[in-house]
């Protein structure tokens, strides 16, 4: 399955459990993807879905967001799911904006909440 599409997963602290629940509910579909994730988010998803193929990068505030951004810029990420917490101020908010900008510049689909993520993986199922 070397030609699998690559999905990037990121979640703010208050949304990590939501992303893990999303992954568990969609584990069969996600198993068809190569997944990259920021460190803590990837760990949380692996806790509930240990069979998924997830490459864990650095934690978001330590550069994981930038690592995913670099993968987007090199064409190595096909879709981005980023569960954003809009109610909590983030000291690294500029990283979020940078990822959104890269998703737009490189024209990859990006979901910011579960409803959109469900639609994205359903659409990309084939």
From Swiss-Prot:
PROSITE patterns: METHYLGLYOXAL_SYNTH, MGS. It comes from the Bacteria. InterPro entries: Methylgl_synth (IPR004363), Methylglyoxal_synth_AS (IPR018148), MGS-like_dom (IPR011607), MGS-like_dom_sf (IPR036914). SMART domains: MGS. Keywords: Lyase. Pfam families: MGS. Residues 1-126 form the MGS-like domain. Catalyzes the formation of methylglyoxal from dihydroxyacetone phosphate. This is Methylglyoxal synthase. It comes from Rhizobium meliloti (strain 1021).
């Amino acid at each position: 399955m070397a030609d699998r599409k690559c999905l990037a997963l990121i979640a703010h602290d208050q949304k990590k459990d939501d992303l893990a629940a999303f992954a568990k509910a969609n584990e069969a579909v996600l198993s068809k993807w190569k997944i990259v994730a920021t460190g803590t988010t990837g760990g949380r998803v692996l806790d509930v879905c240990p069979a998924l193929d997830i490459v864990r990068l650095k934690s978001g505030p330590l550069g994981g967001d930038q690592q995913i951004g670099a993968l987007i810029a090199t064409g190595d990420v096909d879709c981005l799911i980023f569960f954003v917490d809009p109610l909590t101020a983030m000291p690294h908010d500029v990283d979020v904006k940078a990822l959104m900008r890269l998703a737009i510049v490189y024209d990859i689909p990006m979901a910011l909440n579960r409803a959109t993520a469900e639609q994205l993986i359903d659409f990309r199922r084939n």
